[in-house]
Regions:
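N-terminal organellar transit peptides
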Residues: 2-133, 139, 155-157, 167-290
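Glycine-rich, charge-decorated loop segments at or immediately adjacent to ligand/cofactor-binding or catalytic sites
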Residues: 140-151
Length: 290
């Protein structure tokens, strides 16, 4: 009788342990599933705090347009991001909700994107009564440059770059498509290329006029037109980096007094995690000892 009781008690304890282990496994999987969400929320909170710090230090409305390749934590797939209509809608709403007399600080870190979206943002910024400052901590290419040109002030890191704003038709630069017409007779060119050339001609003309209008708000008309033709008509390759020194040679006023708050904000957009990091360093800030 006593042996049966002992065996029953032992079996009960084993079953309780199995249930406890099962509960722990379920808890582990729940935490594993929630971890990316919690990490994302904490990162978003830190970014919001960094923007508030910039607003307090400069008495402005801070907006960020950052397109960093990010990785989904759960599956590890890279997400490539560009300027799109969703970005323009959000920024237009932010501008609309900002008092007309309040300065706007826009942080731009982008490889470019849709001309429509970038031009909408640029026009909205150019029409502001209060000063607009665009901060470029690393690069603002193509559509990002278009947005930067609309600002009252451009502030760049000493090593940051802008880029040309010449339109792209599919996978080809519009200016390069037009040069085919100059080097071949129409009899040697297929219909598709002729159609692309027609679209390319219109795209270059439209973008050059748009850039001229933006630059005319801060530069003399003749100089604005000259710069627009240089940047929008294929004088450079589309990925050509325009450094601070070169922009100043082109008479585009650029400052390099980058606020520390912007640098700290960009640290909250780390590179996608890899098995072996491609860049390693000990983070230090100007004025602080390592």
């Amino acid at each position: 009788m006593s042996n049966a009781i002992v065996r029953g008690s032992f079996r009960q304890r084993v079953e309780e342990k199995i249930v406890q282990i099962g509960n722990l496994l379920w808890l582990f999987f729940i935490v594993l599933m929630l971890q990316p969400v919690i990490s994302r929320r904490m990162l978003e909170y830190a970014r919001a705090q960094a923007l508030r710090n910039l607003e307090r230090s400069r008495g402005s409305r801070a907006i960020a347009l950052v397109h960093r390749q990010e990785t989904m934590n759960l599956l590890g797939f890279p997400i490539l991001r560009y300027i799109n209509v969703e970005d323009s809608e959000e920024i237009l709403r932010a501008i609309k909700l900002t008092d007309p007399q309040t300065p706007i600080d826009l942080i731009v870190h982008s490889p470019g994107g849709l001309v429509l979206a970038a031009m909408q943002i640029a026009h909205a910024l150019a029409n502001r009564k209060a000063p607009v400052t665009v901060f470029v901590p690393h690069f603002a290419m193509s559509g990002g440059t278009l947005i930067a040109l609309s600002a009252s002030h451009i502030v760049m890191d000493e090593n940051a770059v802008l880029g040309p704003v010449d339109p792209q038709i599919g996978e080809y630069p519009a200016a390069s498509i037009l040069r085919v017409l100059e080097r071949k007779s129409h009899d040697e060119i297929d219909d598709r290329t002729l159609i692309l050339a027609d679209v390319a001609e219109k795209a270059i003309r439209q973008l050059a006029l748009g850039v001229t209008a933006l630059l005319s708000k801060r530069l003399p008309g003749e100089k604005a037109q000259r710069l627009a033709e240089l940047l929008a008509t294929g004088h450079f390759t589309h990925d050509y980096p325009l450094t601070v020194e070169e922009l100043r040679r082109l008479d585009i006023p650029v400052s390099t007094e980058m606020p520390e708050e912007v640098t700290l904000f960009m640290r909250l957009f780390p590179q996608p995690k890899q098995l072996t990091p491609s860049v390693s360093y000990l983070p230090t800030l100007p004025g602080r000892r390592a």
